[in-house]
Amino acid sequence: MSFPPPDPLPEPPATPGPYPESPQELYLDPEVLAQELAQELLGDPLDEIEGADSAGVDVAAECDLGLTLLQGPHEQRMQGLRIFCEHRDPRAVPLLLPLLSAACPILRMSAVYALGRNPSPQAVAPLLTLLAGDDNGYVRKAVAWSLGNYPDAPVLNPLIRALQVDIAAVRLWAASSLADAGGTGPAKADPAAAQLLLSLRIDSEPAVRSNSAWGLGRLYPDLVEPRQREVVESLLHTMLHDAESGVREEARLALEQLEQPAVLQQLQTLVDEGLIA
C-alpha cells in the first residue's frame, strides 16, 4: 500500500496530504514523556518505515537481532521495535502482540506501527480494540495508520467511526487508510467514499479534508458512475471554495490524477476563465 499524509512526538510522514496534525490534541502521560525524553527514545517509529534504506544492511541479521531485543528490557524492546518498523519478519509477530497491552503508551504505539509493517490476522482484533478504547491519542493514531495494511480484514466500519468522532490526528490517518480499506472493490469503496465526501465538506481540520480529497481520488476507479460524478463535483467545489489553499491544491491534484478527459477539460476551462491558475 502507499503510505499516506508534524507534531513533536511523533512526526508523521507526508505522503497523502500536506498538513500536520495538531499536537495539542494528543494526550501523552507527562511522566512517560519525561522518561522517554531522558532516555532519548522519542521519535515516531513510522519515520523508520518511511526512511528505511536497506542498502548494505544484512536484513536477516537485523531481524535476528530484533527478535533478541524484543525479549529484553524496555530500552532493548524499543530498539527491537524500531527494527520491525523497518523490516518484515513473521517471527516477530508473537513477540509484538503482547506489547499491544504494555503499560507504556510508547511501547504500545511502536508495537502498533511494527504490526502495520508486519500484518498478521492475529493482530486485527487487538488493533481494533485499541482504536476503539485506548486513551492515548498517539496509540490510536498509529492504529489508524496500521489498519490501512489490513484491507481484507473488517476494518472499514471502525475506520469510518474514527473519522467521524476521534481527534484530528486520528481522523487524518483514518481518512488515508479508508482509501486502502475501501480499495478492494465497489462494496467497500462506496461506504468509504460516502464518509470521505462528508469529511471533505464538514471536517474542521484542513489536514483531514486534504487527506479525504486524496482518498477520494484513490477510490474513484472502484466507484459506480453516480458516486464518481459526486466525487468529481465535490472535489471541484473544494478546489474552488475551500478556505485553505493546501486543501484546494490537494483537491485539484486528485482531479488531475483521475486522468478523465472530461474532468481535465473542466479544469482547463476554469484556467481559461481565470478561476484557477
PLM feature spans:
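HEAT-repeat alpha-solenoid elements in large eukaryotic scaffold proteins
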Residues: L70, R209-G215
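Non-membrane alpha-helical segments in proteins
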Residues: E75-E86, P105-R117, A142-W145
